[in-house]
Amino acid sequence: MTGKRTTKVDFHLHSYASNVTDYYAVNTFAIPESYSDPLATYRELRAQGMGLVTLTDHNSIDGVKEMLDAHLPGVFISSEMTATFPEDGCNIHVTVANMTEAQFAEVNRLRSNLYEMLDYVETEIAQEANAKAGNRIAYFMTHPLMSTQNRPYGREGALTADHIEKALLLFPCLEVRNGTRTRSLNEFTHRLVTSLDRETIERLANKHGIVPRGRTPWLKGIVAGSDDHSGINQGRTWTEFLSPEGRESTPNDLVDAIRNRRTAIGGEHGGPVTLAHAMVKLLYDGHRKGGAQPGQGTQKNPAQRTVRMGGPIHELLRFVFDSQSTSVWQKVGFQARMTLKKLASMRRKGRDADRAFEAILADEAAALLSDVEFRRKLADAARTDDRIFLVVSSLIHRIFRRYVERLRSAQSLDLIRLVKEGVALAASNVFVSLPYLVSYLHQSSDRQIVEDVRSRFDFGEHKKLVLVTDTFFEINGVARTIRKMIDEAKRRGVDFTVVTCLHDSERAEVIAAADAQRYIDSGQLRILPSIVNLDFPEYQGLQIRIPPFLDLLKYLQESGFTKMQISTPGAIGIAGLMAAKLLQIETSSTYPTSFPEYVENYTRDVSLEALAWKYMCLFYHSVDEVVVPSKFIARLLHQRGMRNRKLLILDRWVDADRFHPKHKIDDFWQRYGVPEGATTFLYVGRIGLEKNLDTLADAFVELRKERPDVHLALVGDGPYRKALEAKLAGEPVTFTGFLEGQELSIAYASADVKLFPSTTDTWGNAPLEAQASGLPVVVSDQGGPQELMVHEVTGYCVKGREVHALVDAMHKLLDLDRRKRMGAAARAFVEQNKLAEPFSAILDSDSYRERFKKNKKVAQHDEDDRSPEAVDRYLVDHRVSHATTEAF
C-alpha cells in the first residue's frame, strides 16, 4: 500500500473495562487485565497515527462507550467475546466489530454457544442490505493458536487442532499478527491462514460436518492488533487498508476492506517479554492507585487484594513509566534520597548476613539508580519494553552478586547456613523474575498445539539448533570438538549457534587469544556476560561462570530455536535446561566428562563422588536425548537407569590430513633436548591428576631401570605439572607446554609411541590424533579411548592404574619393527573409519537415528533391556567393528 493514503486501526486493544480474566497469572497477582483509561488511550492512538479507534475489551463495551460519550471521531464499538464450543467446553476469543449496543447485548447473551452466536451475527449481516446506511459488522477469531484457559494440552476443554480446523471453516477472517505473540507464531499463523485452498476446506468440511462460511471460504481476511493491556504498546501493531478518495475512512469502510480481503497488517511482534512487562506495568499501576479499582478514581475496594511494592522499587519503576512527567526537583530530591540510602547501606555492610531479603531488595533498587552507567543506559533505551527489561535484569544481577558475596565473605559456613543462603539466593531470583517466568510458561504452553497443527497441515519446520556450553575458550577436547562442530554445520548449511558466557573483564582478552571473532561475526557464536565468575573447588584454572538467566531465556525465545544441545552440565548447561523446559523445546545433552570420577580423584572422598553421580543422573534423566562419546559411557549410564532409547553415540573422528605421518621431522625432538636415537614416548593432553599421570611417571621410571635409551615428552599444561616435574626430577623428561596447529602435528608424527593412561576420559582425541600420525598407542581399559584402537594391532589396551601392565606394553613397543607395523595399522584404522559427515547425532539426530534403525533392525524390547548386550545392539556406532583385524 506504499504511495497511497491508508487508514490504520489497532484492532486488538484493552482498557480498564476488561475486568474479568481467565488468565491464572493475572488472577494470582490479584490485578485486573488493564488500568488503561479509554480517553487517554484514544489520544495515544491518534498520536500513533490511527485513523479509526476501537477497544476490544473482554465481553464489555463500557470502555469504548466512554469514547463515544465524549463524541470522539472515528470510534466504533467492538468487543472480544469469550465464546464456547458447546460440544466440549473449549473457549476461544472472537472479536465482533462495529456493533450497536443492542447487537452487543445479544452477542453477549449467546456467547456460551459459539455456533448460535455466529449464526446471529451472520443473520445481522444478511439484513444489512435492507439498511444500507446502518452499521456493517465484521467478526474474526483472535490469536487462533493460543489457548484461552491455560489448560494443559490434551485436557478436556483445551484448544486442539480439531478446534483450529473448525475455526477455519467458521471464520471468514482471522487475526494473524498479535502484538503480544512471537514473530514465529505470528508468521506461522499467517502462513496457515493464507495457504488454504479449496481442496483443504472441502476436506475439513466433510470431516467436521460444518458448512464453511463465505463464497470462497479458503480465502480469508486478515487483521492485526497490539493486544495491549498496560498502555505500553498501544498502536504499535495494526490493521491497514486503503482510504477512500476525497473523504475520511469510516468503520464501514474497514468492514468492507475485511470482507473484500483488502486489509494489510503492520507493526511489531511481541512475546513473553511483552506479556511480562505488561504484568509489571499493571502491578505498578495497581500500587500507584493504592488498590483502587480501574475507573473508580482513588476509591479502594476493600475486597481487592493487591501486590504492594516497596518504596525504592516503586521509585525505580516510576523512572521507567513516568520519566517524562517527573520534574527536575523530583529528580533532584530522589537523587538525594538515593545517596543517603547508599551511605546507610555502606554502614550496614558488616551486618549484611543478618538482613532480610526485602531489605536487600530495597537496598539494591536504591543503589541501582545511584549507578551513573545504569542511568545512562536507562536514558538511552528508546522503548519502554527495553527500559523494563534493563531494570529487572540489572536488579537480579545485583541481588545475585550480593548473595554470592555473602557466601564468600562468611568466616564460617556450616551446612544449615549454606542451605539457608542457597535457598535465599534461589528464592530472591525467582521472586524478581516471576513475571517473566510466568509469561514464558504461559506462552510456551501453546507449543504443542502449534506442533499438532503443523503436522495436520503438513507444514515443514526450519530446524534451528543451539548448543549451550560452559567451555569454549579453554584448551580441552570439548572446546575443540565444538569448534569442529561449528565448521561442519556451516559446511552442511545447518542453522547452528553456540551460546556461552564470559565476564566483561575477560571478554576482550579471551576472544582475541582464542581467535573466536570469526564465529561471532558469522552469528555462530553468542557470548552472554556472566553475572559472576567463581573458582571451581580443587580444580585450578577452571571457572564457573554464572549466566544471566533472563537474557539467555529472552535470546533463546526470540531466536526461535527448535532444539537445544547441552554440551556441559555446568552452570550454563543448567540454565539452558531450565530455559528449554520453560520454552518447551526439545533437549539433548552430551556426556563430555566423567565428572564423578574427577571429583573422587581430586577429593579422595567417595561420598562426594556418589553425590556427583546423583546430580549427573538427575541432569541426564531430565533431557530428551543423551549423546554419549563411547559404548563404555553408554553402558555406564545404562547401569544407572538411563533408557537405551535416549542414547546415541556421537559420530566423530579425527582430521586425518592435519594429523598424518607426512608431518614427521627427524630432528624435531632434538630441539627439545631429546638425544638422537632415543625412543620418544609422548603424552599429549591436560596435565591433571585425573589423567593418571602418576601411573605414567612410575611406569617410565621403572622402564628406565632397564632401558636408559628412552625419553618422555609431555605436551600440555595443567595444575599437576609442578608436582609431576618434582616427581620426575632427574629423569630424561621434556615438558613443552601447550603446542597447537602445525607444531602439534609435527610433534605427534615425530614421536615414537603415544601413551594415554587416563581412566576418566569419555572419548580421547589424543589417541586418535596419534594413530592418524602413524604412532602405536597405549591406553587403559577404562573409558572411551579403548574403543578408538585395536588391541595388539594398533597398540595395547592395558589395565587401568596398573604400573607393571603399562611398563610391559612400553617395553614391547621398544621393538622398532613392531612399532612400524603397529603404526601403519594405526594409520589404516583411522583411514578406514573416516567420516564424510561427522556430528550427525547432533546436527541431524532424527535422520541419524532412523538410518541406524534401518541398518540394525533393533527389536523393540532392546529399548528397555538392561543387559550390556542390549546396549551394544541398540546403540548406533559408525565405527568399523573391532572384532576382526584382517583389514590391518
How would you label these PLM feature ranges?
Residues 1-89, 232:
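An N-terminally biased module of ancient metal coordination in phosphate/nucleic-acid-related enzymes
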Residues 4-33, 102-239:
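Domain-core and long-helix interface of multi-subunit machines
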Residues 467, 675-691, 697-701:
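Conserved donor-binding/catalytic core segment of Leloir-type glycosyltransferases
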Residues 632, 653:
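Carbohydrate-associated surface elements
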Residues 722-742:
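Nucleotide-activated donor-binding/catalytic signature segment of Leloir-type glycosyltransferases, i.e.
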Residues 759:
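Aromatic "clamp/platform" in nucleotide-sugar-dependent glycosyltransferases that forms part
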Residues 776-779:
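Short hydrophobic beta-strand element within catalytic cores of glycosyltransferases
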Residues 791-792, 796-803, 811-817:
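Conserved acidic donor-binding segment of nucleotide-sugar-dependent glycosyltransferases
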